[in-house]
């Protein structure tokens, strides 16, 4: 397994923190990023305390967004839609030549169970257009519920659709998904992120209808190796 330095921007939240925790357990160096370094350090300390319960060394660090992104080779964006562009703009100079994994979902409260894609069709595709092809933007994790991510003994029962224009970057993210204990599925170019972003609202509607916390998706009919 190739080891990465992963900056999780928005790692103080439920999804980002859960991903950070599982990647750290898998042996990656993880840096929590936040607008305020103090919040990032506090979140890192909390996550390291959880790792200690599993006899894993405290390997999660915390820093301001720009510093975290500068130190990483893979940057993961897990901020709310309203903060997406501002966060990307803040760290733009630190992203050149790197893989940016964007988990943004264009949810517009209060109707989060209704699909409301932006005018351009995809929030993540808009970030690729903003950054240019010098940054390898990959869309992933929109269909993964944060509900059980911090419970390291809980198996997350879903696949992860991975979209991006750069195939090697997609391969990197599919491998990182596997390190979480999940299956990553190559789902085409960044334009297809519109479909994965829309799925989140569909899954929220399913959760509400069936009174469950973490409905997910499975892709069937693939070769066993996939």
PLM regions: where:
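NAD(P)+-binding Rossmann beta1-loop-alpha1 motif at the extreme N-terminus of oxidoreductases
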Residues: 1-49
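Rossmann-fold NAD(P)-binding glycine/threonine-rich loop
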Residues: 104-147, 151-152
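Active-site-lining helix/loop region of Rossmann-like oxidoreductase modules
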Residues: 158-226
